[in-house]
Amino acid sequence: MLQTFSPSYKPLHLPISSLSLSSSSSSSASSVAFPVTRLLIPPRLRVLPNPRRRCSALPFDIRGGKGMSEFYEVELKVRDYELDQYGVVNNAVYASYCQHGRHELLESFGLSCDAVARNGDALALSELSLKFLAPLRSGDKFVVKVRLSGSSAARLYFDHLIFKLPNQEPILDAKGTAVWLDKNYRPVRIPPEVRSKLVQFLRNEES
C-alpha cells in the first residue's frame, strides 16, 4: 500500500533584515536543509534598472524613423492611351505615376530597383492608398511629388502628391508602403549599405 509522507517541519520565513552579504552568512544560509518559500533580496537590490537595448541599425531604421522634409518632384505629361472611356486618366494609371516618382526618388539616393532585383532581393509595394481630388485629361502636364515620410527595420513609407501644371491644382493624395523582401519573398531588414545611403541623403538634405 502506498503511503504519503508529510514532512514534520514548516517552511522557514526569514526577515529581510537578517540577510547579510558577508561570506559567513552565505555559508550558513547554504547549509539550511529545508526550502525557503520567500525570496530574500536586500532592499538596495530590490529595484534594478532596466537593461539598455543595443541596436546595430542606424537611427533611420526604427519604427517611425525620420523622413524627408522636402518633396522630390518629377514632371510628366498625360498620354492618350492612359485615358478611359470618359476621356480622363484611368484611376489605375495613377498608381503607375506614383511608382515612377518613387523609383526616381530612390535613384536620387543611389538606389536602383533594377540593381536590387539583380541581387535577388526586392523592394515591393505592400500598401497604397489613393485619394482622387480632380481628373487629368489628354495632354495635361503635371508634377508628381514624392518624399520618404518614415521607416522601420524592413519598410519604407512614402507620401505622394500630384498637381496639375501650371496652376498647381491638386489632383491626387496617396500614401504607400514598400517592404524589403529576400529571395524567398519574406520581409527582411533593409541591408546596411542601403540604410547608409538613405541616412546620408537625409543628412545632406538637412545641411
From Swiss-Prot:
Its EC number is 3.1.2.-. InterPro entries: 4-hydroxybenzoyl-CoA_TE (IPR050563), HotDog_dom_sf (IPR029069). It comes from the Eukaryota. The lineage of its organism: Eukaryota, Viridiplantae, Streptophyta, Embryophyta, Tracheophyta. Signal peptide: none annotated. The active site is at residue 84. One of its GO terms (cellular component) is chloroplast. GO terms for biological process: lipid metabolic process. One of its GO terms (molecular function) is fatty acyl-[ACP] hydrolase activity. It is found in: Plastid, Chloroplast. Belongs to the 4-hydroxybenzoyl-CoA thioesterase family. It holds the Pfam family 4HBT_2. Mostly expressed at low levels in glandular trichomes (lupulin glands), and, to a lower extent, in stems, leaves, flowers and cones. This is Acyl-acyl carrier protein thioesterase TE3, chloroplastic. Keywords: Chloroplast, Hydrolase, Lipid metabolism, Plastid, Transit peptide. Residues 1-63 form a transit peptide. Acyl-ACP thioesterase involved in the production of fatty acids and beta-keto fatty acids. May play a role in cuticular wax synthesis.
